[in-house]
Curated annotation (Swiss-Prot):
Chain positions recorded as Mg(2+) binding sites: D342
Species, as recorded: Rhodothermus phage RM378 (Bacteriophage RM378)
Protein name: RNA ligase
Stored InterPro entries: T4-Rnl1-like_N
Coiled coil regions, renumbered to chain: none
Annotated ATP binding sites: Y48, R63, K83, E198, K311, K313
Amino acid sequence: MESMNVKYPVEYLIEHLNSFESPEVAVESLRKEGIMCKNRGDLYMFKYHLGCKFDKIYHLACRGAILRKTDSGWKVLSYPFDKFFNWGEELQPEIVNYYQTLRYASPLNEKRKAGFMFKLPMKLVEKLDGTCVVLYYDEGWKIHTLGSIDANGSIVKNGMVTTHMDKTYRELFWETFEKKYPPYLLYHLNSSYCYIFEMVHPDARVVVPYEEPNIILIGVRSVDPEKGYFEVGPSEEAVRIFNESGGKINLKLPAVLSQEQNYTLFRANRLQELFEEVTPLFKSLRDGYEVVYEGFVAVQEIAPRVYYRTKIKHPVYLELHRIKTTITPEKLADLFLENKLDDFVLTPDEQETVMKLKEIYTDMRNQLESSFDTIYKEISEQVSPEENPGEFRKRFALRLMDYHDKSWFFARLDGDEEKMQKSEKKLLTERIEKGLFK
């Protein structure tokens, strides 16, 4: 079952983490590469963020992977999909080279643009417009989203936090899970796998108006280091569970269209024609399928149970997403920091706006980091932060009396990524209002 002689991106990540003297030093180094880390005890979640250039193989694994730090090293608990790129997005040479070392066949696309790089069969998988939730085993079945270790984030609907709902994604998932599946489903799951679901729900709508809540299995991956971090087809695992349960459990799956590749169509980048061609086929697979759907993921198996994915979003979806998302300075800062602007940035004017935004953010972070380093060094010469942390913190606070953005400095001192991001959102919003909306 497992793929042989494959070194997965998460193994590159482990190798990189092991090169540092401590998790704290590793996290700090990754942060400078645009990889954010959320920490709960000995658990670490790695998620790419603003500024990640995706020029290292281990960057691909940082899409919500959760690892545990042990005395003997790092253990993978959950490993969702590797990073997959938007159609037409340029890939860094190291990433292209990595995929080419795994490929069955020669590359189709010589310009390093995300798309069908390989002359291999492909399938188009329905891209659901929901929330990715991963189920993994750690002394019991637990879940996380791609941005939260415990899935305790607030529900977002139409791009806005639904403050009227006293629920988290974790509560919404288990509530939906209990409605859709029998509780004994968990007994049929493989504890050496993590299960990647897409949760769609009227109360967590983005664009597509799903009328009924649902949980759809979109991916399965081994987290057994001895066998390898290979993927298992969702339909394959669904059939196994269906058979083992005597036909009592029927996992929901996304619509999948398998077809021979049309390289002329894709090389010409005529995506509108592609959607005109495949939308009726998808509608035939899913009864009552909406014409306006998010799009699809094009999947190619480039080595045994190793997949290369490209996401292609429906033009109408992109336009509706633009309309649904109120682009206030605060919302723009939020989308930018969450690395989600690629969902709707299309026009040259918008591309120019993003470039300005990057300049504003880079300037802001450089100023903050420079000030932090200066203050930290200055106070460290007076009192040791290790030997007398209380006095150090007191002097640190006094030194910040005249600073507008004290919360960022304390979050940076404590290594609290979530508070840093919250503070950065506030600061970036202020700078956007001055720099882009004046």
